[in-house]
């Protein structure tokens, strides 16, 4: 596990004035107990925040891209004076895209490095693996992209007191895409091809199916694959022989890129739809530009958005990385700003006080949209539907949170 710290960062493009992004305080429930890490972290003159991300392994792109956003936010916050006069120090560790390693990383960050909060992992399974450590030590963990339905609640439906996410749940994505099929694409029938080894893909497929059926549509069939598969000929041969308006293909970029490429090579021309797992630079490399047409996916952010907050973020990101930001960059950026905002409102208090401030966040002006944290510690915000042309974002439709 490689440790990298960032502190006393030099001035960056687009200074982020912390007071200007502070969410208003609501009536969140304060977790009980005492914080064991606050004294240690505050005594050192910096505020330690841990990063538990997938920096190697099968979904490394998500972690790497999220970290870029976090680091940009840290640059801006530190250049603007830090949080209550203290600089942010990021301690970054690699969970290797592995659930057991995620638990190990969370344990080290919380019990040895004494961080006040942990951002990441990016994916739901790895994020859930870090939760027991967080709750036991009363240190908040935050993910910008863990979208599984059961991330912020336990098996009995009780809210996890130290667990938060700045993204919406999978059911929101599946529902939005099914409505998009009916209302925008004017489709009624769909074939589902899903990663049966992934709770993420299974959950998305279920919410899409339920919503499409409720709208009078139908699912003509379901096919499955598992993470790591590379030969999809059997599935796609069946798909080519069937009749449907769209293919719903929820999954991660590794397999999705290969499936879309193979489908187009077989002559399957139907629109292919998915979710935020598509948003990786690797999708284009795997699928190829010519295959990535008539492809749509739900997402948290679009670089086509002309909102001033988004435009400013894009300019700052390009100045630092010389690249167009994607949703994982934006979600990492928002996640650190969300924590910084709560630390400001908690007057630097950590543990239960920080968790309460996070839970009380209202109308936070995120790059991924203005959001409020609900009673289950989910972010309520708009959703974007992105259309690709030659693998590049060409259209975006904003669906209001109330829809």
What is each model feature region?
Residues 55, 158-223, 246, 339:
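An alpha-beta-alpha
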Residues 64-66, 80-154, 225-230, 257, ...:
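Beta-alpha junction/loop-to-helix N-cap segments that form part of ligand/metal-binding clefts
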Residues 260-333, 387-401:
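Extracellular/periplasmic periplasmic-binding protein-like sensory domains
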Residues 102, 165-190, 202-204, 232-233, ...:
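Hydrophobic alpha-helical segments within soluble ligand-binding/sensing domains
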Residues 1-48, 79, 400-403:
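Short, low-complexity disordered leader/linker segments with a strong preference
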Residues 320-329, 340-393:
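Segments of small-molecule ligand-sensing domains
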Residues 40-69, 93-100, 122-123, 193-202, ...:
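Extracytoplasmic "Venus flytrap"
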Residues 205-298:
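Extracellular/periplasmic bilobed ligand-binding domains
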């Amino acid at each position: 596990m490689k440790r990298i710290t960032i502190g006393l960062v030099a001035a960056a493009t687009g200074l982020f004035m912390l007071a200007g992004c502070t969410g208003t305080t609501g009536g969140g429930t304060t977790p009980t107990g005492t914080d064991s890490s606050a004294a240690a972290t505050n005594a050192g003159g910096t505020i330690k925040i841990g990063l538990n991300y997938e920096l190697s392994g099968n979904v490394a792109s998500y972690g790497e891209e999220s970290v870029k956003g976090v680091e940009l936010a840290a640059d801006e916050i530190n250049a603007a004076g830090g949080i209550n006069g203290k600089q942010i120090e990021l301690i970054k560790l690699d969970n290797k895209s592995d659930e057991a390693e995620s638990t190990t990383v969370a344990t080290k960050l919380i019990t040895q490095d004494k961080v006040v909060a942990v951002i990441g992992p990016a994916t739901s399974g790895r994020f859930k693996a870090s939760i027991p450590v967080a709750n036991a030590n009363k240190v908040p963990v935050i993910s910008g992209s863990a979208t599984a339905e059961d991330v912020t609640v336990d098996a009995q439906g009780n809210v996890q007191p130290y667990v938060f996410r700045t993204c919406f749940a999978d059911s929101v994505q599946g529902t939005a895409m099914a409505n998009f099929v009916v209302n925008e694409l004017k489709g009624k029938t769909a074939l589902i091809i899903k990663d049966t080894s992934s709770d993420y893909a299974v959950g998305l497929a279920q919410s899409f199916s339920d919503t499409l059926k409720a709208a009078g549509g139908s699912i003509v069939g379901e096919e499955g694959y598992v993470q790591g598969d590379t030969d999809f000929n059997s599935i796609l041969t069946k798909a080519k022989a069937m009749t449907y308006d769209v293919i719903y293909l929820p999954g991660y970029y590794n397999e999705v890129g290969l499936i879309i490429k193979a489908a187009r090579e077989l002559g399957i021309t139907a629109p292919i739809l998915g979710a935020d797992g598509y948003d990786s630079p690797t999708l284009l490399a795997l699928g190829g530009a010519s295959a990535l047409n008539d492809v749509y996916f739900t997402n948290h952010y679009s670089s086509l958005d002309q909102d001033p907050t988004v435009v400013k973020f894009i300019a700052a990101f390009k100045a630092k990385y010389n690249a167009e930001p994607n949703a994982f960059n934006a979600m990492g950026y928002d996640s650190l700003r969300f924590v910084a905002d709560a630390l400001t409102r908690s007057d630097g208090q950590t543990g239960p006080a920080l968790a309460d401030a996070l839970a009380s966040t209202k109308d936070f002006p995120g790059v991924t949209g203005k959001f409020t944290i609900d009673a289950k510690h989910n972010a309520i915000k708009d959703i974007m539907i992105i259309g690709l042309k030659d693998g590049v974002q060409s259209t975006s439709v904003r669906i209001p949170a109330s829809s």
